[in-house]
Amino acid sequence: MRIDAYSIAFTSQYESAQSSLSRVSQKGEMVHTLSLHNESESLELLARGTVMTQEGVVDLELLASLSRKERYVQESLVHQSAIDPLVINFEGGLAGVDTTNKFSFDLNSDGKKEMISLLGSGNGFLAIDKNNNGIIDDGSEILGKKSGDGFADLALYDDDRNGVIDENDSVFEKLLVWHKSALDEGILTLKHARVGALLLDNVASMFHYKNEGESNATLQKSGVVLFEGGRAGW
């Protein structure tokens, strides 16, 4: 797929409520927290627009939502270091995170593996197999490690500076989708994943994936992916 032009408008609505009693101490990047929390959170995203491709015009309207309610007591010691990998949902929804199961992976590529959350079924990390060994070795091969912003990292590969990653960009054939869930694991090219184009425009979409007070991941930004056949998703 090749994109000639596009116009997209985003609307986001985020609501959260929290009551808590906390005691926090911090030393350097280490944060110790003891807290009693009542939390609720909801996110609604809407994208409307048109995309001009060589095959014709795609009119898109995407609506997605996430919500949660939770009460918990928490004591934690956390090392705060933000890495924002890009995730593609093959079914077109927002990124899905498994808040129960984790796996060992060196996400910040410092030579030490951490326990991070698996993705939900039908979701995958956007990656580049830099050493062509057929596996994703660590976070250095996942978009989002370099700057902490996956969209900013991806924009570096926009050869024609049109705000789209598609077949006109040399990186397109190198990009992979690494899907790793509790049910399956594998690596797909964008073509095999039926991904036609990735739009670099994005919208702030803060949402926390938590389970019994444990923060497993945070959704920070969302953008639009176009699949072959004209279907659009987040």
List each language-model region with its residue ranges:
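Calcium-binding acidic motifs and repeat modules
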Residues: R2-W234
